[in-house]
Amino acid sequence: MNKQKIMANRRRDIIIIVGCTILALIGGYGWSRGFGNFTWFRNFDTPGTASVDDAVLNYEPLIQQYAKEYGIESYVPVIEALMQQESSGLGADVMQCSECYYNTEYDQTPGSIPDPEYSIQTGIHYFADCLELAGCKGPGDIRRLRLALQGYNFGHNYIEWAIKRDGGYTEANAQAFSDMMKEQLGWETYGDTTYPEHVLRYYK
């Protein structure tokens, strides 16, 4: 083999090694081409961790049970963060979901659910709907997760409205939706316009 061919092979080997190293470094990232542009995306399946009170962690077996039942078991840490924001694991309606349409056992009025397990089942069932409507691809899909979380707080009608208006959640459109609902219902307040960030402070 002549010297030029040996050098060419070495350069090829170096390029392969460098390329493999770059791929290893970017790990869970990849790229796809859509609408004429290159877009980057994460491996959305990787869950984070929740930093919550022991009162919330005491419900982890039930959270895991119902998250699995409704096909969102990878979101257990998110649900724990959600419960931390809603109730810190205290009281009976730990998911604060008594007004949800899945509550068919008790009055759909604030705080009417007297059974923590039923609250967990109902809240997780509803959150699963919110995730589906938001098109959330996994617990690492933070942009769509924010949309689903705001939908849990406002009601799922917000999700479709926000997608049509802005393509997803923004604090500005959450405020606009809240103002619109206050006017329609004649209420002083409507929901928490920064609910996603209030939940996600417990989720990393």
Each language-model region and where it sits:
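Flexible domain-boundary/linker segments
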Residues: 80, 84, 99, 140-141, ...
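Short linear capping/connector segments at secondary-structure termini
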Residues: 45, 82, 96-103, 107
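N-terminal carbohydrate-binding/catalytic regions of secreted carbohydrate-active enzymes
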Residues: 60-67, 78, 82
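Glycine- and aromatic-rich loop/turn segments at beta-sheet edges
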Residues: 91-100, 170
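Short, charged helix-capping/linker segments at alpha-helix termini
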Residues: 67-76, 137
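Short, functionally critical alpha-helical segments immediately adjacent to catalytic or ligand/cofactor-binding
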Residues: 73-90, 97, 120-124, 148-153, ...
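Non-catalytic cell-wall polysaccharide-engagement segments
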Residues: 2-57, 106-121, 125, 129-204
